[in-house]
UniProtKB/Swiss-Prot annotation:
Cofactor(s) needed for function: pyridoxal 5'-phosphate
Superkingdom of the source species: Bacteria
Annotated catalysed reactions: L-alanine = D-alanine
Catalytic activity, EC: 5.1.1.1
UniProtKB keywords: Isomerase, Pyridoxal phosphate
Keyword Isomerase: yes
Annotated SUPFAM superfamilies: Alanine racemase C-terminal domain-like, PLP-binding barrel
Annotated active site: K34 (proton acceptor), Y261 (proton acceptor)
Residues with N6-(pyridoxal phosphate)lysine modification: K34
InterPro entries per UniProt: Ala_racemase, Ala_racemase/Decarboxylase_C, Ala_racemase_C, Ala_racemase_N, Ala_racemase_pyridoxalP-BS, PLP-binding_barrel
Role noted for this protein: Catalyzes the interconversion of L-alanine and D-alanine. May also act on other amino acids.
Name listed for the protein in its UniProt record: Alanine racemase
SMART domains: Ala_racemase_C (SM01005)
Length: 368
């Protein structure tokens, strides 16, 4: 096995799902396992969550749904993103549920389904303030028209929050009001759908009025909080992924020794330069050059020089005992020290979501 790997603790994911269900109460939880389950491995995570009681899943794209089916997972799967109408046959074959988010798309689906003499279940997306895909909440006539199309059966209607992870929840509450306008209109017209849903991880924790029939846990399943503005006491989450590598070489070098491309790191004293066999092609951000930290022997050590495509170097005190083959942790816990995805995100100038989903296919996932 490659001396770089990500350990995924499935029991921690199951624990986090239990926290979701505790918060959701009567609403059903639909785990979001898009982007390879946020880098954790969609198939393995889905199987673990099914064992914990999950009955349906959400993904972003058609291929993610197909991968689940090919792995033998037959639970309902909602595709949250855009699926072109020419993929209708695949949706039918794999029994996947698309999202319809504008009138022209729905009509194109209806035309193909009519020709095939088939009916397809779908969920209707409402834009209440995200400004992304979806019928604008005021387009009530178009929404009603689509919901009455033949060969298409609306199983659900949903929206997505733009700012539920911020300290100020006023915009999220406005989005709830807008979504309720649509729901009340449909009820007045005698149009019923089985599932109404809106809540992402932040809303699951902070906006119980947004739980409706389904909630869509994403980042919290993997032990991460949506932002620093979401109070930690709302849910006890356990991070599920640890990124590890084995030391490839140790060099004892004098003061004035330069390291990596551009010689941007120069030792100020005698130092151990420890090489690790992973780099930005594995999803370890180049922006962590001379900024990131690595755990070796349960202590924090700084990245020395620029992160390379396939390797990086760490500056360790010359008195430390480090040997080739020793284990280093780049994300997660070693001893009493922890490097969090949020900490890494702050250094890079991004969010913890990107830290996790950026871990590339080259890194084997090991399930513990």
């Amino acid at each position: 096995m490659r001396p770089v790997w990500a350990e995924v603790n499935l029991e921690n994911i199951r624990h986090n799902f239990r926290e979701v269900k505790r918060l959701a109460r009567q609403a059903e939880a639909m785990p979001v396992i898009k982007a390879n389950a946020y880098g954790h491995g969609a198939v393995e995570v889905a199987k673990a969550l099914i064992a914990e009681g999950a009955k349906r899943f959400a993904v972003a794209i058609l291929d993610e749904g197909i991968k689940l089916r090919e792995a033998g997972i037959d639970a309902p799967v909602l595709i949250l993103g855009y699926t072109p109408p020419e993929e209708v046959e695949k949706l039918l074959f794999y029994n996947l549920t698309p999202t319809l988010h504008h009138r022209e798309l729905a009509l194109a689906y209806q035309e193909r389904l009519e020709r095939l003499k088939k009916t397809l279940f779908y969920h209707l997306k409402i834009d209440t303030g995200m400004g992304r895909i979806g019928f604008w909440y005021e387009e009530l006539e178009k929404i009603e028209e689509v919901l009455k199309l033949k060969n298409l059966e609306a199983e659900g209607v949903y929206t997505h929050f733009a700012r539920a992870d911020e300290q100020d929840l006023s915009f999220s509450k406005l989005q709830i009001e807008r979504f309720n306008i649509v729901l009340k209109h449909l009820k007045a017209k005698g149009i019923e759908v089985k599932y109404r849903h809106a809540a992402n991880s932040a809303a699951i924790m902070r906006l119980p009025e947004a739980h409706y029939d389904l909630v869509r846990p994403g980042i919290m399943l993997y032990g991460e909080y949506p932002s620093r503005d979401v109070p930690r006491e709302l849910a006890h989450l356990k991070p599920a992924l640890t990124l590890k590598a084995r030391v490839s070489q140790v060099k004892k070098v004098p003061a004035g020794f330069t390291v990596s491309y551009g010689s941007t790191y120069v030792t100020s004293k005698a130092t151990l330069i420890v090489s690790l066999p992973l780099g930005y092609a594995d999803g370890y951000f180049r922006r962590l050059s001379n900024r990131g930290v690595v755990l070796i022997n349960g202590k924090r050590w700084s990245i020395a020089g620029r992160v390379c495509m396939d390797q990086l170097m760490v500056a360790v005190d010359e008195t430390e005992r480090v040997n080739p083959g020793d284990e280093a942790v780049l994300l997660g816990k070693q001893g009493e020290e922890t490097i969090t995805a949020m900490e890494m995100a702050d250094l890079v100038g991004t969010i913890n979501y990107e830290i996790l989903t950026n871990i590339s296919y080259r890194v084997p996932r090991i399930y513990v």
